[in-house]
Amino acid sequence: MRLVLDSGNSSIKYGLFINRELFGSGIIKKNKSICSILDPDILSKINIIASCKVTEELPIKDLPKVKHIQINNNSIFPFNVDYKTPQTLGIDRIVACSANYKKGESSLVIDCGTCVTYDYISKSGNYQGGAISPGIKSRFQSMNNFTEQLPFIDRYKKNPQKIGDSTVDCM
């Protein structure tokens, strides 16, 4: 079983894979250990950990000794990275593109986290860059800070209405 970790700015997303099939997934807070949320039987079956991290700390120090693959900007990816400043390109963005890349197809990868990122890979297999914009929490803070009447929303609905019928639902 493989444990795949994406350690972002605010939280850590994880996926458990058996062969190439997703077995389970979730999100944990940065200060929690993966061992505190997974069943000991599942933990004992993990033999490879693959991770990319934006921050330094990973929640795996309590795990048994298993092979750990740290993905970074020097890793080999299935496409060419055609980016002016590759040393500044977030590894989380490249990993998200790798997970979605299909040879011979162009793709736009949108990842919603602390920031919302948009990344484009051409049909010929060239990562060409993208855009970074504020995430949901930053957007809510901005709407409240820079308008007179929009309220601050600190919790948002996971499945909002398609068309809002109140100010909060519209936001």
Where are these regions (language model features)?
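N-terminal glycine/serine-rich phosphate-binding loop of ATP-dependent small-molecule kinases
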Residues: 1-77
